């Protein structure tokens, strides 16, 4: 490619053309300004000129005998004065309109420039915000944990910046302790239910009790109140006679295999708890049997003084 070279003469001629164009524009604007100022001056002096012309025609009309010529000259002067005034007013209004348009164009241009600058500032702000977000997103470390380990109620941003702590993991011994506690709580309840079932009399026993009440007073005297030893033996028999329901041996082995290992200390604690529960149950059975015997003796015995068994039972009580 050939380099384009410009001579000094061409550069100087270009500058001269630019200067001539600028000077011509300045001269035209100056001429228009002068014309506008002259027209404004003429409008200002038009009132005084019209008043002086009216006085002159009035005096000339009175003194001159040729009134027709005076009237024609007056008409011509008034027409010329009106035309000149209209011309001046039109020129002034045109110049004023041009000035207003120029100023309005300048105002619109400035508004457009201001709006363009505001738009550029807005775009720059958006780009800065986007760049900051991209940098922050690069700094944020996403959590590497599974969703189920995220704690509920925590903020998403905090969980994204700081890794969520793992939930506490319990050992096998802790889980076995919990299982053993649940079993120890469930066993006394089941035994109490069996004790209550053994304690509640069957319908056949109730029938025998009603028959004994219907017997004669002599037989009632021979009948003795049941002792606590018999009740305890009966409860033992009912416990021993309660068969375990037949179950599948494979299912039993599966449940045994699933059970966690238990510490021997837990066996000791459970045995002590069972022993204390059993002693409390015996005491409750004794007190209940004594109360029942006393109530039966009160209901079945009519003669209090001649009843030796009642006095002996009261002595025992």
Curated annotation (Swiss-Prot):
Signal sequence, start to end: none
Subunit structure: Binds SCAR.
UniProt keyword terms in alphabetical order: Cytoplasm, Cytoskeleton
Chief location bin: cytoplasm
Subcellular location: Cytoplasm, Cytoskeleton
Residue stretches of biased makeup (Low complexity): 196-206
Similarity-based family: Belongs to the ABI family.
Protein name, as recorded: Probable protein ABIL3
Physiological role: Involved in regulation of actin and microtubule organization. Part of a WAVE complex that activates the Arp2/3 complex.
One GO cellular component term: cytoplasm
Organism: Oryza sativa subsp. japonica
Biased segments, Polar residues type: 182-195, 226-235
Biased composition (Basic and acidic residues): 278-288
Segments for region (Disordered): 162-296
Basic residues composition-biased segments: 171-181, 207-223
């Amino acid at each position: 490619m050939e380099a384009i070279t410009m001579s000094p003469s061409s550069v100087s001629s270009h500058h001269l053309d630019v200067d001539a164009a600028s000077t011509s524009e300045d001269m035209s604007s100056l001429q228009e300004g002068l014309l506008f100022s002259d027209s404004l001056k003429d409008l200002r002096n038009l009132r005084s000129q019209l008043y002086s012309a009216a006085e002159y025609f009035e005096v000339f009309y009175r003194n001159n005998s040729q009134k027709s010529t005076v009237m024609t000259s007056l008409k011509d002067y008034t027409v010329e004065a009106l035309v000149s005034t209209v011309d001046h007013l039109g020129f002034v209004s045109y110049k004023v309109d041009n000035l207003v348009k120029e100023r309005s164009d300048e105002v619109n241009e400035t508004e457009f420039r201001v709006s363009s600058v505001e738009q550029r500032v807005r775009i720059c702000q958006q780009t800065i915000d986007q760049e900051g977000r991209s940098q922050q997103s690069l700094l944020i470390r996403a959590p590497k944990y599974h969703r189920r380990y995220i704690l509920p109620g925590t903020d998403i941003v905090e969980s994204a910046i700081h890794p969520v702590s793992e939930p506490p993991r319990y050992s096998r011994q802790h889980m076995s302790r919990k299982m053993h506690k649940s079993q120890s709580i469930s066993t006394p309840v089941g035994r109490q239910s069996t004790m209550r079932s053994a304690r509640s009399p069957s319908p056949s026993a109730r029938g025998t009790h009603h028959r004994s009440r219907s017997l004669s007073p002599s037989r009632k005297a021979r009948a003795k109140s049941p002792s606590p030893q018999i009740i305890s033996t009966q409860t033992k028999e009912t416990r021993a006679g309660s068969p375990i329901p037949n179950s599948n041996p494979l299912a039993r082995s599966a449940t045994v295999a699933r059970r966690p290992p238990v510490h021997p200390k837990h066996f000791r604690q459970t045995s002590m708890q069972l022993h204390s529960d059993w002693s409390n149950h015996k005491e409750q059975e004794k007190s209940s049997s004594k109360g029942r015997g006393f109530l039966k003796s009160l209901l079945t015995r009519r003669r209090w003084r001649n009843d030796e068994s009642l006095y002996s039972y009261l002595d025992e009580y």
